[in-house]
Amino acid sequence: MDPLPRRASLQNTGNVGEGWVRQYLCQQGWQILAQRWRCPWGELDLVAHKADVLIFVEVKTRSPGSWDRGGLLAVGIPKQRRLIRAAQAFLSQHPHLSELSCRFDVALIERRASREGVSYALVDYLPAAFEIC
């Protein structure tokens, strides 16, 4: 069987990472409202709600030793601005959620390949990873 094209393989890796974070959040009592929510300004990987808090979670799945410190450097100012605009679009479509306290979290997932196969691990979860300016 032919290997997946690189883009499809990376997309699948990202989807698996999002699944791990989704499971983690559910175990923490969060209700997932959306996954891979898209708008003209970008995509929100996960949107979740618990009590009076709404979180927008950016998930980065990387192999060990990645150039961007496990995905953390990929969430720079331009990416943060896109996430904020996407969150504003999400809230405009879900006005009943606009009174909740909102925050932006970042989840870092590590993908490890070995002879036994591929495994994933949540390396770090950063609540309120950046401020809304």
UniProtKB/Swiss-Prot annotation:
Top-level division of the source organism's lineage: Bacteria
Gene3D superfamilies: 3.40.1350.10
Record field: transmembrane: none
Record GO terms (molecular function): nucleic acid binding
Family classification: Belongs to the UPF0102 family.
PANTHER family tied to this protein: UPF0102 PROTEIN YRAN (PTHR34039:SF1)
Protein name: UPF0102 protein CYB_2119
The species this protein was found in: Synechococcus sp. (strain JA-2-3B'a(2-13))
Lineage: Bacteria, Bacillati, Cyanobacteriota, Cyanophyceae, Synechococcales
